[in-house]
């Protein structure tokens, strides 16, 4: 919403009311001190120019009470008496409909075509390649008349305002006719215009360049992004040709703006004050990008300064609720230093509370998102740790189960071997007589047929050691087998003989015990397989270690045939591992 300032008062007008006021000023040329009375006069006549002009020229219009009941807005107090405004966005009912600023297309440099190419005038915002109208030409002309009148009136008013601005900036010392610089019909510079050419040898340009808010090479879209995401003010400055050596083409107005206003110490002091909440975009309209920006904003003459920010704005009166949009907060006055600073200060102070609230909400939103992300990451990490623990627990349980299964299989294989060992074998033919002595001092003698393999001898001795029975009495073997089965049934580290304990307790013969052992082997899906020996047989004189060879019979070993003596020596775990590695 346009704001008109006059001394200690400010008037919030709609765009239509501002146009009416401008037309009234062009017609009557009233002095600036009559502005409050003129606004009151127009309000009392419903902003109708004809009755207001009639009353104005009658001469009896000053001091008239405000019949529309609209109070005059007082200006923002100075810093000494400034009361902190209430933080928060403006009420919805009073949210203005401000002009919206949009970024340039990302590929505007490629899509832009110089005016006059192929006989057409195109811009990057062209929606159609061509336009044709096949209707009545008279109706088409009628459609264009309102737009032509509006453009002409705006052009005439801008012309007069520019004359007044130039006269005020130059201080009235130049009696020559002021020259008004217009935005060119097409950009005249294809390359980037350096800042040194724009500022030239202007005094205090180094102080201006030291501002954190000013980045000479920043693009328009990047400046808009910063203003939008960080809720900063964007000071958009569009100037003309200030660097040309030809005095006929140089934009004197823009040059005076830079020297007298923008680089003035008071301006620099205020810009430093709001440096953290500001982004400055200073470009020359003879370059492509600022030229397109000027076309978007409807800038016809240079210089122009706009203040842009991401505020609550209604794009149209049909919207019930405003939304955050990059909007033009105001076009700053450039006809004098004091008016420029006053207009800039008023707009900044007006919208600063809203931007502060928006920035705080944005910070809180980012913090909440970061906290939520940290919580989600912690939750995912906790789930991952639980999953790893579950996997480790499952592996541990499986490992323990595998150990139990291996131990059970080892016990069942030895029980099966004991059942086979107690079975009678043929005693015909030659036999080897071997005497055994265990590490505990037990001695016993056994006879083996000549075709008995060394592995079978190991198995036979292993059964005696496993049951701790050193005779061939079937009754002793049966009792030892029953005791062993009962021990395994009561052992929690073993998986066998957990069911059918009554059947196990009543079995007394070797055949019954063999049937029970075979059932356990079948239930665990185990085959006979090789036995694991934790001892070795050694012939002492001469010392010779007998290995459990399945392909060598006892009659092939001179130390054992026909008679021999063997020591049963227990193997340590390290010796067993060495033997396994040698076999591999």
Curated annotation (Swiss-Prot):
- A single GO molecular function, which one? protein-macromolecule adaptor activity
Lumenal topological intervals: 102-151
- Could you tell me where this protein is found in the cell? Endoplasmic reticulum membrane
An example of a Gene Ontology cellular component annotation for this protein is: endoplasmic reticulum
One Pfam family matching this protein: UBA_4
Biological process per Gene Ontology, one example term: lipid droplet organization
Q: How does it sit in the membrane?
A: Multi-pass membrane protein
**Which CDD domains does the entry link to?**
UBA_TAP-C_like
Q: Which residues cross the membrane?
A: 81-101, 152-172
Task: Please give the subunit comment from the record.
Answer: Component of the DOA10 ubiquitin ligase complex which contains E3 ligase SSM4/DOA10 and CDC48-binding protein UBX2/SEL1. Component of the HRD1 ubiquitin ligase complex which contains the E3 ligase HRD1, its cofactors HRD3, USA1 and DER1, substrate recruiting factor YOS9 and UBX2. In ERAD-L, HRD3 and YOS9 jointly bind misfolded glycoproteins in the endoplasmic reticulum (ER) lumen.
PANTHER family in the record, alphabetically?
A: FAS-ASSOCIATED FACTOR 2, FAS-ASSOCIATED PROTEIN
How is this protein named in the record? UBX domain-containing protein 2
Q: Which organism is it from?
A: Saccharomyces cerevisiae (strain ATCC 204508 / S288c)
Identify the gene encoding this protein.
UBX2
């Amino acid at each position: 919403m346009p704001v008109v300032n006059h001394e200690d008062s400010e008037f919030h007008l709609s765009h239509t009311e501002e146009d009416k006021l401008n037309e009234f000023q062009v017609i009557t040329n009233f002095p600036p001190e009559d502005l409050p009375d003129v606004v009151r006069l127009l309000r009392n006549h419903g902003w109708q120019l004809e009755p207001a002009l009639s009353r104005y020229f009658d001469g009896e219009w000053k001091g008239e009470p405000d019949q529309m009941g609209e109070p005059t807005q007082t200006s923002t107090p100075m810093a000494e008496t400034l009361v902190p405004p209430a933080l928060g966005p403006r009420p919805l009912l009073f949210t203005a409909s401000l002009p919206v600023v949009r970024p340039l297309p990302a590929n505007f440099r490629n899509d832009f075509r110089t005016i006059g190419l192929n006989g057409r005038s195109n811009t990057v915002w062209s929606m159609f390649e061509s336009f044709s109208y096949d209707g009545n030409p008279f109706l088409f002309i009628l459609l264009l008349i309102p737009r032509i009148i509006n453009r002409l009136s705006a052009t005439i008013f801008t012309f007069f305002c520019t004359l007044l601005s130039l006269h005020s900036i130059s201080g009235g010392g130049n009696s020559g006719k002021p020259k008004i610089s217009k935005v060119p019909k097409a950009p005249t510079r294809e390359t980037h215009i350096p800042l040194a050419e724009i500022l030239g040898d202007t005094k205090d340009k180094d102080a201006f360049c030291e501002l954190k808010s000013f980045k000479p090479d920043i693009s328009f879209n990047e400046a808009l992004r910063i203003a939008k995401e960080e809720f900063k003010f964007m000071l958009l400055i569009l100037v003309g040709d200030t660097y040309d050596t030809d005095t006929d083409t140089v934009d004197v107005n823009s040059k005076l703006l830079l020297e007298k206003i923008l680089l003035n110490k008071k301006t620099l002091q205020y810009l430093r004050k709001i440096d953290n909440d500001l982004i400055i975009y200073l470009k020359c309209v003879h370059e492509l990008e600022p030229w397109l920006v000027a076309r978007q904003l409807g800038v016809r003459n240079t210089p122009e300064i706009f203040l842009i920010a991401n505020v609550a704005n209604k794009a149209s009166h049909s919207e019930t609720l405003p939304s955050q949009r990059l909007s033009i907060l105001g076009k700053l006055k450039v006809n004098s230093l004091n008016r420029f600073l006053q207009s800039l200060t008023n707009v900044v102070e007006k919208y600063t509370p809203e931007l502060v609230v928006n920035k705080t909400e944005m910070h809180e939103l980012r913090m909440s998102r970061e906290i939520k992300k940290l919580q989600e990451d912690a939750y995912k990490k906790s789930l991952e740790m639980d999953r790893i623990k579950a996997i480790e627990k499952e592996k541990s349980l499986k490992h323990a189960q595998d150990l139990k299964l291996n131990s059970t299989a080892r016990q069942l294989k030895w029980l099966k071997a004991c059942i086979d060992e107690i079975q009678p074998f043929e005693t015909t033919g030659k036999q080897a007589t071997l005497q055994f002595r265990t590490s505990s001092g037990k001695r016993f003698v056994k006879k083996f047929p000549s075709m008995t393999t060394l592995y079978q001898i190991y198995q036979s001795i292993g059964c005696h050691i496993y049951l701790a029975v050193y005779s061939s009495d079937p009754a002793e073997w049966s009792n030892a087998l029953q005791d062993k089965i009962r021990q395994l049934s009561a052992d929690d580290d073993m998986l066998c003989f957990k069911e059918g304990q009554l059947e196990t307790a009543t079995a007394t013969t070797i055949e019954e015990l063999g049937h029970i052992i075979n059932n356990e082997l079948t239930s665990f899906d185990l085959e006979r397989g090789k036995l694991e020996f934790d001892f070795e047989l050694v012939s002492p004189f001469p010392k010779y270690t007998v290995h459990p060879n399945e392909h060598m019979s006892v009659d092939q070993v001179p130390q054992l045939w026909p008679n021999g003596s063997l020591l049963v020596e227990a193997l340590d775990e390290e010796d067993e591992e060495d033997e396994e590695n040698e076999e591999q």
